Amino acid sequence: MTEKGLTYADAGVNRERHYELVRRIAAHTARTLRRPGTLGNIGAFGGLFQLDPARYPEPVLVSGTDGVGTKLRLAFLSGRHDTVGIDLVAMSVNDILCQGAEPLFFLDYIGIGQKDLAVLEQVVKGIADGCLQAGCALIGGETAELPGMYPPGEYDLAGFAVGIVNRDRLLTGEKVAPGDALVGLASSGLHANGYSLARRVLLKVDGGAFDLDDRPPELGGRTVLEVMLTPTRIYVRTVLRLLARFDVHGIANITGGGLHENIPRMLPEGTAAVLRRGAWKEPPVFDLIRRLGPVAQAEMEATFNLGLGMVLAVPADQAEAVAAAARELGEEAWVVGEVAAAEPGGPRVVVRR
């Protein structure tokens, strides 16, 4: 008689479901592994990547890690999981781009109470799509089945990106100076920040104004869900080309903390950014939040990107050319302000009408 005892599956961890997930996501990850430098396949203990010393004689590796935050709640509520993976990649690769780094590879972590194969395949497909947009390889990851840790239908995501830049091309913000112009690249909307406030204002289920499928006139025929699930724009291909053509002094990725917290991260001490409100196009979702909250303008600026996904500091005599080149590469772009000397004790970011 075979002894029958308690199994891992009895405790909520199903090995067969894990093996089936690996089979399902293999085709998605394989799409990203064509990137030069990638070695081996998914499934080894470590992901492998070989640097090219000819391209980078003095290589500096730049790393970044992030998540998607409460934007995931939109995926849970709607059952649409194929875009939050793009957000996951965007949050890290856009960060390392601010140091001038070309993304090389990406790894992901997914924590979930019970593996739902259809949901997880959608998530990984989105991660692979994001890696393709960023030109990096998805060389590894972890999907942890954690019974009792997450409510049914929910999960959390974390991502980790590594990029490379030659030492003489590293962006530290040291070159940014008063008189530099600021060029803004358009966001695709909310990106993946400020969602706790946005949900509180917009979503009826969280105490706000609308159902997911409502179409407020301000949103131009789009549903609230479509606007709030729009993935974060990945700027890698555009910005790497701008870096090759122009003397970019600094880059700020406008994420959590909005304009006021992120632009100063590229500014030397004693300098401030002066933005001209109205110089760029603000997506209508922001005015909807501002009006319905109501949310004060200062709070909006300290929470959201307000339509500026990335801001570049460049010499004033190159600003219009940089904006035009970005538009040729498919971005909406504007000259949105300048760098000035900071007032003693004054703000590092000033938004003027």
UniProtKB/Swiss-Prot annotation:
Segments forming a coiled coil: none
Record-listed E.C. numbers: 6.3.3.1
Catalytic activity: 2-formamido-N(1)-(5-O-phospho-beta-D-ribosyl)acetamidine + ATP = 5-amino-1-(5-phospho-beta-D-ribosyl)imidazole + ADP + phosphate + H(+)
Cytoplasm recorded as keyword: yes
Localization of this protein: Cytoplasm
GO BP term, example: adenine biosynthetic process
The organism's place on the tree of life at top rank: Bacteria
GO molecular function terms attached to this record: ATP binding; phosphoribosylamine-glycine ligase activity; phosphoribosylformylglycinamidine cyclo-ligase activity
This protein's record includes keyword Ligase: yes
Keywords, sorted A to Z: ATP-binding, Cytoplasm, Ligase, Nucleotide-binding, Purine biosynthesis
Listed GO CC annotations: cytosol
Top EC class, one word: ligase
Predominant location category: cytoplasm
Pathway note: Purine metabolism; IMP biosynthesis via de novo pathway; 5-amino-1-(5-phospho-D-ribosyl)imidazole from N(2)-formyl-N(1)-(5-phospho-D-ribosyl)glycinamide: step 2/2
Gene3D superfamilies xrefs: PurM-like C-terminal domain, PurM-like, N-terminal domain
Pfam families: AIRS, AIRS_C
Record-stated family: Belongs to the AIR synthase family.
Protein name in UniProt: Phosphoribosylformylglycinamidine cyclo-ligase
Protein's gene: purM
